[in-house]
């Protein structure tokens, strides 16, 4: 019984600490614009059509990688 009560108190205490910490850190992100620009540049960094896209290449194709020729291809336009 004592152990159960201690576990319940510990869980409540840890939950309260998490909630207090979350409230204190709201809106305090530094260099917000720098971080978002970096994410965008990483997301758009891709291999153009006609270039090799095999397993040794670290970037992804802007379109899709042909499974047979391992060449980046553009998506067909309808």
Curated annotation (Swiss-Prot):
- Any Pfam family matching the protein: Conotoxin
Provide the transmembrane region boundaries. none
Q: InterPro entries, from UniProt? A: Conotoxin, Conotoxin_omega-typ_CS
Task: Tell me which positions the record assigns to the signal sequence.
Answer: 1-22
UniProt KW keywords = Calcium channel impairing toxin, Disulfide bond, Ion channel impairing toxin, Knottin, Neurotoxin, Presynaptic neurotoxin, Secreted, Signal, Toxin, Voltage-gated calcium channel impairing toxin
* GO terms for cellular component: extracellular region; host cell presynaptic membrane
GO MF entries? calcium channel regulator activity; ion channel inhibitor activity; toxin activity
Q: In which tissues is it expressed?
A: Expressed by the venom duct.
Instruction: Report the locations given in the UniProt record.
Output: Secreted
| Disulfide bond entries | 46-62, 53-65, 61-72
| UniProt propeptide residues | 23-42
Instruction: Write out the domain note.
Output: The presence of a 'disulfide through disulfide knot' structurally defines this protein as a knottin. The cysteine framework is VI/VII (C-C-CC-C-C).
User: What is the protein's known function?
Assistant: Omega-conotoxins act at presynaptic membranes, they bind and block voltage-gated calcium channels (Cav).
Family membership, please give it.
Belongs to the conotoxin O1 superfamily.
What name has this protein been given in UniProt? Omega-conotoxin-like SO-4
